[in-house]
């Protein structure tokens, strides 16, 4: 994997985002028990096994510097299971409570109607704007129009809810 600084820009932004939230939580809870650690909930929504692996790698990179300062919980959901109403609804509720949602997919892929429906359900359940949405893509591909359309849609979902939106490209982990 290319270890360039640019490759980890979104991860660094998320670390900063978490650090700011951690600082805010610490300031708000000055009188509470010192053993209480802030909890960060993360939901990964992934297209397939390779996308799930990339997302988990990205998640590990983001939390590496912060794991001693706060607790993290992680839920992983595959695009395909989101189409099952009971599972999709459970995933949407969990993701609505998440501090950040990582959507990991292939650059060439368009979001299916079922995945877009799920994104609309999820975004409709967000109560506050303290979340972040991360679009995690594999290495650059040829179909720029497809990814631009998908990223534009995701940015609009985030903008409607007033949540932070990040994009990140991660290179194929199998080439390491």
Regions found by a protein language model. Name each.
Residues 25-63:
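A short, flexible N-terminal coil/short beta segment enriched in small residues
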Residues 2-39, 114-119, 176:
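Short N-terminal or domain-adjacent regulatory/targeting segments
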Residues 49-51, 81-84, 103-112, 139-144:
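Short acidic, S/G/P-rich loop/turn micro-motifs used as interaction or catalytic elements
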Residues 141-172:
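Short, glycine-/small-residue-rich phosphate/pyrophosphate-handling segment
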């Amino acid at each position: 994997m290319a270890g360039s600084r640019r490759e980890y820009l979104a991860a660094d932004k998320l670390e900063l985002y978490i650090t700011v939230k951690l600082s805010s939580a610490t300031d708000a809870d000055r009188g509470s028990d010192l053993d209480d650690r802030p909890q960060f909930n993360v939901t990964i929504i992934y297209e397939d096994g390779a996308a799930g692996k990339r997302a988990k790698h990205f998640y590990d990179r983001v939390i590496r510097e912060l794991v001693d300062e706060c607790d993290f919980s992680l839920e992983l959901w595959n695009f395909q299971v989101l189409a099952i109403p009971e599972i999709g609804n459970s995933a949407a509720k969990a993701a609505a409570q998440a501090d950040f949602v990582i959507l990991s997919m292939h650059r060439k892929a368009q979001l299916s109607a079922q995945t877009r429906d799920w994104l609309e359900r999820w975004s409709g359940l967000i109560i506050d704007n303290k979340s972040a949405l991360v679009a995690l893509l594999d290495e650059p591909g040829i179909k720029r129009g497809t990814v631009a359309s998908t990223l534009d849609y995701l940015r609009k979902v985030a903008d409607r809810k007033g949540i932070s939106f990040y994009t990140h490209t991660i290179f194929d982990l199998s080439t390491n």
